[in-house]
């Protein structure tokens, strides 16, 4: 096999691996995870003996869970009916009065991706029981459209407006993340097709075009991943922090799905670099050989 064909085959293999990793990342839900078990244990130690034994593991009243059946009284404040409830709706329904202490906040182990946010099973017995009985939803869809503003109890109007503006900005960050990832997959697929065509037609030209498409995919992936990180940071630093930030002892961080996306980015940049750099390297070698022959003559 000629060196150019070998480089093209290697680039095509890297790009196909990158495509598989990127599709895996997009369609899995383990981009970001939270684990409040350590926080829960510290809260239980601090209030030991204050609650009955069967209530020590409950951090959230049942009325604030995303229930499937008829909504509690507080949920009637939502315009458009109870169908808008999701795992985060307790933030808007409780008001600040119910969140005067960190241990009074409803915190459960969750994992989320681009499309859904779900509870982990097997970590908290209360949420496990409610999910198994069909009372609470295990997963809720992440919104990519702006819904009607939610009326918030016990929160000043200015703060309510700030929360709604933050929701709007967060929605834009999510759209940018999903949009650029979709474009990355489309451009990467085109690059793989062009790299395959290079084995049969205009090898030098098609290899160069495939390299440019691979590098463009890398740019789209970089924008998307950085925007996703910005959306997570923005969400955790929203006001009021008593509602949106996490306590210091809650473990949270990125999970394996986003690492698949970063590995995909590395593979595609390597593939694009090979396709772009090889023609220049080969030309340099040819020029050196010609100069060597001329000098001997």
Swiss-Prot record:
InterPro entries reported for this sequence: PMP22/EMP/MP20/Claudin, T178A/B
Composition skew (Low complexity), residue ranges: 68-79
Gene behind this protein: TMEM178A
Subunit details: Interacts with STIM1.
Topology relative to the membrane: Multi-pass membrane protein
Pfam families: Claudin_2
Similarity field: Belongs to the TMEM178 family.
Annotated protein name in UniProt: Transmembrane protein 178A
Sites where a glycan is attached: 158
Disulfide cross-links: none
Extracellular topology ranges: 26-179, 230-257
Signal peptide span: 1-25
Originating species: Homo sapiens (Human)
Renumbered residue ranges of the record's region Disordered: 41-84
């Amino acid at each position: 096999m000629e060196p150019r064909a070998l480089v093209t085959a290697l680039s095509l293999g890297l790009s196909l691996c990158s495509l598989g990793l990127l599709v895996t990342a997009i369609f899995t839900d383990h981009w970001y995870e939270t684990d409040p078990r350590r926080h829960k244990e510290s809260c239980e130690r601090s209030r030991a003996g204050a609650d009955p034994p069967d209530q020590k593991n409950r951090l959230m009243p049942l009325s604030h869970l995303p229930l499937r059946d008829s909504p509690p009284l507080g949920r009637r404040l939502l315009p458009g009916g109870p169908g808008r409830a999701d795992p985060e709706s307790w933030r808007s329904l409780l008001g600040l009065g119910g969140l005067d202490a960190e241990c009074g906040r409803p915190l459960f182990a969750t994992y989320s991706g681009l499309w859904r946010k779900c509870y982990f099973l097997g970590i908290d017995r209360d949420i496990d029981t409610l999910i198994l009985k069909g009372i609470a939803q295990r997963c809720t869809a992440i919104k990519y459209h702006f819904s009607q503003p939610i009326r918030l109890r016990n929160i000043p109007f200015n703060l309510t407006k700030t929360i709604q503006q933050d929701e709007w900005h967060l929605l834009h960050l999510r759209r940018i993340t999903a949009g650029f990832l979709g474009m990355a997959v489309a451009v990467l697929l085109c690059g793989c097709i062009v790299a395959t065509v290079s084995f049969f037609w205009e090898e030098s030209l098609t290899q160069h075009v495939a390299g440019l498409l691979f590098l463009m995919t890398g740019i789209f992936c970089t924008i998307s991943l950085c925007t996703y990180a910005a959306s997570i940071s923005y969400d955790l630093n929203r006001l009021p922090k008593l509602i949106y930030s996490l306590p210091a002892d809650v473990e949270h961080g990125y999970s394996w799905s986003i690492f698949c996306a970063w590995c995909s980015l590395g593979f595609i940049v390597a593939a694009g670099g090979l396709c772009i750099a090889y023609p220049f390297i080969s030309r340099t070698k040819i020029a050196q050989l010609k100069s060597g022959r001329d000098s001997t003559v």
